Design a protein with these regions (language model features):
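H-loop/switch region of ABC-family ATPase nucleotide-binding domains
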Residues: 60-61
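Conserved ABC ATPase signature
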Residues: 1-3, 7
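Catalytic Walker B motif of ABC-type/P-loop ATPase nucleotide-binding domains
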Residues: 24-27
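Conserved catalytic motifs of ABC-family nucleotide-binding domains
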Residues: 20
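Helix N-cap at the start of a conserved alpha-helix in ABC-type nucleotide-binding domains
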Residues: 35-37
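Helical segment within the ABC ATPase nucleotide-binding domain
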Residues: 39-51
C-alpha cells in the first residue's frame, strides 16, 4: 500500500470517471487528508463538475470548504433538511440550525 490518502482518492475518482457517470456521489472525500491534498481533491471535483458537466454530490462537514466549493448546499440536522440554497445565503443562524452550535464554537 504505497499510495497516500490523496492519491487513493484521485484513483477512486478516476475509476468512477471511466464509467462515464452523470453523477458522482462523494462521501467525505477529504476526510483524513492533509490541507494540500484536500484542496487538490476539491479542485478536481469542481473541475469535473464545471468542465465535464458531471453533477458532484459531496457530503462534507467542513463549513468553509462547502462555502468555497459548492453551488448549492443542503444542510441536514437530525435527518431533516434545514437549509437548501446557495452558499452566499448561509447565515450564522443557518449554521446554528445545522450544527446546533454557535458559529464561534466551530472551526470554519
Amino acid at each position: 500500500d504505497q499510495l497516500s490518502g490523496g492519491q487513493k482518492q484521485r484513483v477512486g475518482i478516476a475509476r468512477a470517471l471511466i464509467q462515464n457517470p452523470k453523477m458522482l456521489l462523494c462521501d467525505e472525500p477529504i476526510a483524513s487528508l492533509d490541507p494540500n491534498s484536500a484542496k487538490i481533491i476539491m479542485d478536481h471535483l469542481k473541475n469535473i463538475s464545471s468542465t465535464l458537466g458531471i453533477t458532484c454530490i459531496v457530503n462534507l462537514h467542513q463549513v468553509d470548504v462547502a462555502l468555497k466549493y459548492s453551488d448549492r448546499i443542503i444542510g441536514i440536522n437530525n435527518g431533516k433538511k434545514v437549509y437548501d440554497g446557495p452558499p452566499k445565503e448561509i447565515t450564522e443562524d443557518i449554521v446554528r440550525n445545522i450544527y446546533g452550535s454557535e458559529v464561534k464554537n466551530l472551526i470554519l
